[in-house]
């Protein structure tokens, strides 16, 4: 009842951090649309707005964010699919946050689709991975018998089909991806570039791995199956890969309901991409159906329907251990389609989002990463850097009550408005702590000098991953590097390049917009000049100044008086 649209149920969920402000948002699918909720203050979430849609039990949502150098600001769009109703692909403009959201279009490349996915992005920031081009996959749609197919996000306000974009064989229910950079890219993907993009196709009765590095020339790599339950009792539903890209966790939506199993997650090794092989299995304490899951560090966050959220320790991926759960559906733990539909564990704050079919949005604090070997992370979520300096970043081994094991964590830089090899020198690697060592470890990054003195403030990011030996990722596993520079106050422009007015209309209002940043007070002067219409004869002379205060991003108007004369 707290949602403005008064939905009767909820479904899937995704998250978004606005890199202009650092504010965090939940995007939750509802029976009658998609709601965007500000969760920056997790104890006081507030709905920003809802984009309405036709009634459906199934919606899926993903977000793409990128830096627009033309306006000096981050831009973001959400893409929502719907199944069972003809409501197309809903594209949502997130660029008026925190004040509002708006509908860009109902894109008609398909009439409906069960799921949507975006490859080659970081799932916390929803930005492109270094050196890779994101593409959007529509999954389980009314086209191509439901097989997944891809679209370009070069113009993110719409979906542009990629040539030969029909991939797969048979209906794809859900998908995930990973980028392979080790020897498998050469020996198994036969890819000449730096990485191989593997799409994981959950295909109802099997899991298929596809090489989609060239999205117009997709090739099947291998197929994974299992036989502990009859095919008639299987539904290969969804899954996710580990951060080391060696294992996939697979969810079957029917084996609890139809084969009488307790919650069962199967683990496949993909050491050989051409032959995925089951190497482990997690069996839960209840009959609740496992639905969707996501990896963060050595934790697996799983929406477990009537059990709510289940969290597994996957330090040993083949032998997961149940380390926590939060019950969003208290009446029972049966094999029914009630309770937690989706989860999103990637917010920079470390908070976890859960969507429950009957009770809505949950924002949870993660208490499952406590470990005697410590939590590995940054002390803050952001730090400042100067042009031309060598920046030293400390990484902590915190809360280690009995640090008897050697532990490690990997690090990688992600470009933002600051670009690698232009604004900073990219580095990556592994930080190591010997047994009983809790001293900070350091990462050094060379920041390029500003030769002109004209560069704007910029930012890029450091990401931690793959903690070892039961050490976990702390809440601050992402660090924003804010590089000093000139303040970007946005750009000023007319909202339209031209407009038409009747001579007898009397006057016309011309609208100006402040795009991008709203930091600082800005102004623009204007003056009319003659064209085919003459100032003084056809239009009254006008000049002046339009002003915006610090933080003001509202549209402004200039009123121009038209002279109604008798001349042609």
Feature locations, PLM:
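Feature marking well-ordered beta-strand scaffolds used for ligand recognition
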Residues: 1-374
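Short boundary segments that mark the start of a structured unit
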Residues: 368-568
């Amino acid at each position: 009842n707290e949602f403005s649209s008064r939905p009767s149920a909820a479904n899937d969920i995704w998250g978004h951090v606005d890199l202009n402000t650092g504010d965090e948002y939940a995007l939750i699918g509802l029976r009658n649309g998609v709601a965007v909720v500000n969760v920056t203050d997790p104890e006081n979430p507030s709905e920003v707005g809802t984009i309405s849609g036709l009634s459906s039990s199934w919606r899926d949502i993903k977000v793409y964010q990128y830096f627009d150098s033309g306006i000096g600001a981050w831009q973001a769009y959400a893409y929502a699919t719907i199944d069972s109703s003809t409501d197309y692909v809903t594209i949502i403009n997130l660029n008026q946050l925190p004040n509002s959201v708006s509908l860009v279009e109902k894109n008609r490349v398909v009439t409906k689709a069960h799921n949507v996915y975006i490859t080659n992005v970081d799932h916390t920031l929803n930005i492109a991975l270094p050196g890779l081009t994101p593409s959007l996959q529509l999954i389980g749609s009314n086209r191509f018998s439901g097989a997944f197919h891809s679209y370009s996000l070069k113009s993110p306000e719409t979906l542009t089909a990629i040539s030969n974009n029909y991939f797969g064989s048979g209906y794809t229910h859900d998908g995930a991806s990973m980028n392979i950079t080790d020897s498998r890219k050469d020996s198994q993907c036969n890819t000449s570039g730096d990485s191989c993009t593997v799409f994981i196709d959950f295909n109802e009765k099997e899991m298929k791995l596809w090489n989609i590095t060239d999205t117009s020339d997709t090739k099947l790599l291998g197929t994974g199956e299992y036989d502990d339950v009859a095919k008639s009792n299987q539904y290969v539903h969804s899954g996710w890969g580990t951060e080391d890209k060696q294992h996939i966790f697979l969810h079957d939506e029917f084996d609890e309901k139809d084969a009488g199993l307790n919650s069962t997650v199967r683990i496949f090794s993909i050491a050989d991409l051409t032959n995925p092989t089951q190497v482990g299995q997690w069996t839960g304490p209840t009959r609740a159906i496992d639905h969707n899951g996501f990896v963060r560090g050595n934790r697996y966050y799983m929406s477990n329907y009537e059990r709510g959220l289940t969290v597994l320790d996957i330090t040993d991926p083949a032998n997961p251990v149940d380390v926590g759960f939060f019950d969003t559906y208290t009446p029972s733990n049966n094999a029914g389609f009630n309770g937690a539909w989706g989860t999103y564990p990637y917010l920079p704050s470390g908070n976890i989002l859960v969507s429950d079919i009957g009770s809505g949005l949950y924002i949870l604090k993660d208490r499952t990463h406590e470990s005697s070997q410590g939590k590995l992370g940054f002390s803050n979520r952001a730090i400042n850097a100067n042009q031309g300096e060598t920046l030293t970043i400390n990484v902590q081994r915190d809360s280690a009550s009995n640090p008897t094991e050697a532990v490690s964590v990997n690090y990688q830089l992600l470009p933002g408005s600051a670009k690698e090899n232009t604004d900073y020198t990219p580095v990556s690697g592994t930080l190591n702590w010997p047994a009983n060592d809790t001293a900070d470890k350091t990462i050094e990054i060379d920041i390029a000098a500003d030769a002109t003195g004209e560069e704007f403030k910029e930012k890029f990011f450091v990401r931690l991953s793959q903690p070892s030996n039961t050490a976990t990722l702390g809440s601050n596993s992402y660090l924003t590097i804010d590089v000093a520079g000139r303040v970007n106050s946005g750009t000023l422009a007319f909202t339209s390049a031209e407009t038409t007015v009747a001579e007898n209309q009397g006057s016309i209002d011309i609208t100006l917009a402040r795009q991008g940043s709203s930091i600082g007070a800005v102004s623009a002067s204007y003056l009319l000049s003659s064209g085919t219409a003459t100032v003084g004869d056809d239009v009254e002379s006008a000049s002046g100044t339009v002003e915006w205060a610090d933080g003001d991003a509202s549209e402004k108007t200039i009123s121009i008086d038209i002279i109604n004369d008798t001349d042609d």
